[in-house]
């Protein structure tokens, strides 16, 4: 069974990691008052970054509640999100949503992100494998 923790290795920590997702996202999912940007990370686990600014969510209490709920939703869905770096960007109005509505919305957003995942090549389709020219 995969660990459902939210350790340091499951977070985007540096500006370089955030920039990689912002500069070339392979997945983009808009939602009600939120935008998800994602990029494949080549790891066996997903990583999450949150952008919840004062301009869009005024009260610190609301920002902290949103961070808690988003992290919790991510934690429960991380098995299906393996291999992604995901940045959640809050927009105006996200702080006014109630907890059940937020849980429901993020459940749908994670599923939409998975549907938008680019198809990976099968080993037989990869260059150099079928023709035996790989090193």
UniProtKB/Swiss-Prot annotation:
It is an enzyme of class 3 (hydrolase). InterPro entries: Ribosomal_Su5_D2-typ_SF, Ribsml_uS5_D2-typ_fold_subgr, RNase_P, RNase_P_CS. GO terms for cellular component: ribonuclease P complex. GO terms for molecular function: 3'-tRNA processing endoribonuclease activity; ribonuclease P activity; tRNA binding. Pfam families: Ribonuclease_P. Its EC number is 3.1.26.5. Keywords: Endonuclease, Hydrolase, Nuclease, RNA-binding, tRNA processing. Transmembrane segments: none annotated. One of its GO terms (biological process) is tRNA 5'-leader removal. It catalyses: Endonucleolytic cleavage of RNA, removing 5'-extranucleotides from tRNA precursor. Signal peptide: none annotated. RNaseP catalyzes the removal of the 5'-leader sequence from pre-tRNA to produce the mature 5'-terminus. It can also cleave other RNA substrates such as 4.5S RNA. The protein component plays an auxiliary but essential role in vivo by binding to the 5'-leader sequence and broadening the substrate specificity of the ribozyme. Consists of a catalytic RNA component (M1 or rnpB) and a protein subunit. Belongs to the RnpA family. This is Ribonuclease P protein component. It comes from Pseudomonas aeruginosa (strain ATCC 15692 / DSM 22644 / CIP 104116 / JCM 14847 / LMG 12228 / 1C / PRS 101 / PAO1). The gene is rnpA.
């Amino acid at each position: 069974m995969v660990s459902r923790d939210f350790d340091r290795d499951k977070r985007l920590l540096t500006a370089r990691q955030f920039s990689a997702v912002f500069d070339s996202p392979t997945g983009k999912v808009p939602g009600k008052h939120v935008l998800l940007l994602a990029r494949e990370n080549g790891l066996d686990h997903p990583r999450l970054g949150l952008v919840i600014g004062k301009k869009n969510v005024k009260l610190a209490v609301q920002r902290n509640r949103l961070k808690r709920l988003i992290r919790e939703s991510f934690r429960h869905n991380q098995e299906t999100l393996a291999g992604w770096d995901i940045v959640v960007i809050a927009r105006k109005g996200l702080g006014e949503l109630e907890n059940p509505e937020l849980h429901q919305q993020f459940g749908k957003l994670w599923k939409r992100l998975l549907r938008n995942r680019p198809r990976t090549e099968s080993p037989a389709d990869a260059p150099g494998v079928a023709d035996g020219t790989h090193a």
